[in-house]
């Protein structure tokens, strides 16, 4: 389910990665939920942020970095048909990554991120800074696409912040 535009969180300066991971860890622990992650363009930055939070083992057990199509298929069971038809940077593939991570990690909640951090976009003309997200919560996938501006590191940091902030919103 694509998240309605009015339900998309707007990042503010106080939404630092540290503040977001702290709030998210508290929410997940209170709700007794286990989180897993599936990352492509962010290359483990989301997992790294989560592992820096207090009490990480109480809410986070595994994360997957699947940069290539082959890795997405082998590790997360993303279908070759989806990759060929929609590309790795698509709503369909993000949703399959989120579902695959849940199944592999035996978790309750997942975050998946796939996109083009830069400096180049996709061969299909998708611009750099385009990032698809999926969150799998209680059997339901939620998806969103964002178009971030900036250099690669800025785009990736914004992607991590957005993924965390939106999950917090979805769990409320």
UniProtKB/Swiss-Prot annotation:
Belongs to the CinA family. Does not have nicotinamide-nucleotide (NMN) amidohydrolase activity. InterPro entries: CinA-like_C, CinA_C. SUPFAM superfamilies: CinA-like. It comes from the Bacteria. This is Protein YdeJ.
